[in-house]
Amino acid sequence: MAQAGGPTRFRPRAVLAACWLAFFWVQSSRAILYSAMPALSAETGLDPTSVGLITGSLYAGFAVAVYVSGFLPISRRLAIAGGSVVTSLTNVAFAWSDSVPTMLAIAAIGGAGVGLYLPRGTAAIVEAFRPEQRARALGWHELAASAGLMAAPLFMGGMLLVAPWRVAVMLWSLVGLGTALVVWRWVPDAVAPAGRGGGARLALDARVLALACMGGACFAVISGFFTMLPTIVATGWGATPAAAASFAGWTRASGLGGALAGGWLADRAGRVPSLVGWYLAILAAVVGLWFLDYGAAFAVLVMVMTVAASGGATAYYALMGDTFRPAERERVFGLIAATASLIGTVVTPVTLGLVLDRISARAPLVALTGAPLLGLAGVVLYRWASPSTNSRTKSDRNIG
């Protein structure tokens, strides 16, 4: 249904399409940088620890902006479109930088630019669709994450065969400028409540931490792990920079199916039961990776893990949308998503980079086991904090 009294261009499908492109840019703008890291390391001698710090800085800026976004007294269009332009420009600046401190600063600013999107875009989709349609809509939205994290590394892998990584990064920045134009045209110009008295009091309880753990577990795989995957396979098993970037791209593509399956399963079986299943699948895949070297079987388990994490992310977003009132969604979404991003996309790559640098290529795979365990802990905490929650959330019991 279109927004009451609003322009027809703000129909749910139009909002979803614009948010899809914005989320594609959110993910691909960062993926284009981390897929360039093996080439950057070969050019400058950058070690895995420095790579982890740069990518951690990228995601730290993202996490801070995700939290701040819901409190800014500016429209969704300005927050999302403006952030897209900022990140496009900082990616170009990153391509021209040479020192690690400069890269750290630029990465943080660029991450902050796209970080403004997540609470605003997710809230727009939640508000545009009825509860029985919401998880499937968010599943389509989550496709953008998989598509962006697939397309950018594949683009980098192909470009490295014919041009320097810096050229690839600058060309990809055009996607962000195009995204800003689409968002400005098709996303509702709503304003988030800001500051004291700017909306309903935030309902902060154990569910916030529980949801942050659930989201952080998924992000640790689909973002944090893939941030370091090109460096892991290049450092640990001697893959070329082009091959490492391409490997990250085509294995990440498996998340496309997981996003759709996650939306369907969350609507049919319920948010919480589907999350438990996805976390158990991630755990099984990660444990299997402990015993494998880079090759076909390794790739299969990476894809299984990616499908499960993408499905879990969709259910997590749907559960978050069901849990909180409309008046508090953008601000609470910002707090939860920022915490989840800090766990999954800052702590994870920094940790993986450190253990890769100091131990071996297999050590990051062992360390990643903490992600699904964290997700399962989040489910337990959520059920404890929501005693009335059974197999489905209150808002989706009428489904199926």
Segments and roles (model prediction):
Residues 64-96:
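Conserved MFS/SLC helix-loop-helix module at the cytosolic interface between two early adjacent transmembrane helices
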Residues 65-76, 259-270, 356:
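Helix-to-loop junctions at the C-terminal end of transmembrane segments
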Residues 86-98, 281-293:
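C-terminal ends and interior cores of transmembrane alpha-helices
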Residues 174-193, 378-383:
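C-terminal membrane-cytosol helix-exit motif in multi-pass small-molecule transporters
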